[in-house]
Amino acid sequence: TKRALGDLITAEYPATIEEALMVPGGAYFPEVKKDTHEVAEPLTGPLRRYVCIDYGLDMLSAHWVQVDTSENAQCYREYDMPDLTAGQAADTLLSITSDEYIDTWLAPPDLWNRRNDTGRSVFDIFYEHGIILTKTSNDLFSGCTGMKEWLRVSEETKRPALTFLKDTCPNLIRCLQKIQKDKNKPKVYAKTPHELTHDVDSLRCFCVWWVRSADKKKNVKKKKWRADLIEDYRNASKEIRALMIKELGEPML
């Protein structure tokens, strides 16, 4: 009977969409709850802003994250849209961002893959449309570890290091709450149902990246670098970036 077989029969023969989502292994982010992770007020003071994306022809998923001088991060905008070309995706992101200054645009390594027919990559197309992407790690375990650390609720503050501005990221929160552990590799989240992975993969780009807090001084004198140096900087390691800043000054990105 279904009662005797429990999770096994639920996974093989789900009666509802909700049952289909609740595969064996359990929720990967059980800590994510609206009462702890969603906040009513935006971060204030000097802020660094990032956009992290997951892109494919089936879906563009993007999230805007701001970080203050105390290493508090807040996701304050999301955007999901299927069937966009790379050029359309870049133009849409720039339009939504408007005049906000974005420190870094974060993306997974597959966007640097060149197509056999054109020899161009998504990175190339975004660059032509005015967005210079920065490559993050695609290591799933490292990314999941980073996400768990950012989303862990502090015993002291009763809040995670990464929060969500109220009513701005409903789909991301839904996906984080629904996505399950990989039943064969419980230390990472499952890649099915695929519909749940876009927003989670996007946020993983931010969480796996080395993130600098906002400068405590509001007025930081920045230097204008050559385009080739800026591209090298965006793709450099933490250590190389520090050396470049030491030699050339803070870049005007």
Model-predicted regions and their roles:
Residues 1-53:
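ATPase catalytic-site recognition across NTP-hydrolyzing enzymes
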Residues 2-6, 162, 192:
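Hydrophobic alpha-helical scaffolding
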Residues 13, 54, 62, 105, ...:
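A residue-level signal for conserved active-site and pocket-lining positions in enzyme catalytic cores
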Residues 57:
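Short, glycine/acidic-enriched loop or turn micro-motifs at the edges of active sites
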Residues 60-66:
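Short beta-strand scaffold segments in enzyme catalytic cores
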Residues 63, 71-191, 213, 217, ...:
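Mg2+-dependent endonuclease catalytic cores in nucleic-acid-processing enzymes, primarily RNase H-like
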